[in-house]
């Protein structure tokens, strides 16, 4: 089982704020996510600028595309994104359109599982050639005190068994990682737990050490 990668979510409102994080920890992570908040705040230039600074890193545009899949994904890929996200409630043709464009750029598409989705949809994504999903505990659910539970673990295992590469996100803390031991997680996303730490560098390194210990 390969080691899960570590992704930092830049849900900053400005590039200046995002740079404060990347200057510290870009070299400690595998994937740099231009979060939805930053995508809205700064547009695709955020993707272009971060990829220019860190060409050796995977840069994800968390656009959460809901419609106009080909147009919006092309905007992201032309800004040199490696991956883009499509929201789970989008029509299957939106996901297919985004994937068609991704292939032109040797990129990839992730389905963001935020909110309601079904296993029938999951099979449609697989049948369409989608290989990545993001299992997401929403920001608002976290604020309401919703913790990771057995239902989450069961769903993640089932997605993995279907052949998806699963990314896990949603207020992920270091102490949550053992919950997922034994599952071939593709990526763990940490946002505030790294960005807001007293030492973001050490927080990122602790995540990497824990991942190596649990999956090594």
UniProtKB/Swiss-Prot annotation:
Gene3D superfamilies cross-referenced by the UniProt entry: Aldolase class I
GO molecular-function term, one example from the UniProt record: 3-dehydro-L-gulonate-6-phosphate decarboxylase activity
Chain sites annotated for binding Mg(2+): 33, 62
GO biological process: 'de novo' pyrimidine nucleobase biosynthetic process; L-ascorbic acid catabolic process
Family: Belongs to the HPS/KGPDC family. KGPDC subfamily.
Organism field: Escherichia coli (strain K12)
Biological or metabolic pathway of the protein: Cofactor degradation; L-ascorbate degradation; D-xylulose 5-phosphate from L-ascorbate: step 2/4
Protein name (record): 3-keto-L-gulonate-6-phosphate decarboxylase UlaD
Subunit-level organization: Homodimer.
């Amino acid at each position: 089982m390969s080691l899960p990668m570590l992704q930092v979510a830049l849900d900053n409102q400005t590039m200046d704020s995002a740079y404060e994080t990347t200057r510290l920890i870009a070299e400690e992570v595998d994937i740099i996510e231009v979060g939805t908040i930053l995508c809205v705040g700064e547009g695709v230039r955020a993707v272009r600028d971060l990829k220019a600074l860190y060409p050796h890193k995977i840069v994800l545009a968390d656009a959460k595309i809901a419609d106009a899949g080909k147009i919006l994904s092309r905007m992201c890929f032309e800004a040199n994104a490696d991956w883009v996200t499509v929201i789970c409630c989008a029509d299957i043709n939106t996901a297919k359109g985004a994937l068609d464009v991704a292939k032109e750029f040797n990129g990839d598409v992730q389905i963001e599982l935020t909110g309601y989705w079904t296993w029938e949809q999951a099979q449609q994504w697989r049948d369409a050639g989608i290989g990545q999903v993001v299992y997401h505990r929403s920001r608002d659910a976290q604020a309401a005190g919703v913790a990771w539970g057995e239902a989450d673990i069961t769903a993640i295992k089932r997605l993995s068994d279907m052949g998806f590469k699963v990314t896990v996100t949603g207020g992920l803390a270091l102490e949550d990682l053992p919950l997922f031991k034994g599952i071939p997680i593709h990526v763990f996303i940490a946002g505030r737990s790294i960005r807001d730490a007293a030492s973001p560098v050490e927080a990122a390194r602790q995540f990497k050490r824990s991942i190596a210990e649990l999956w090594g």
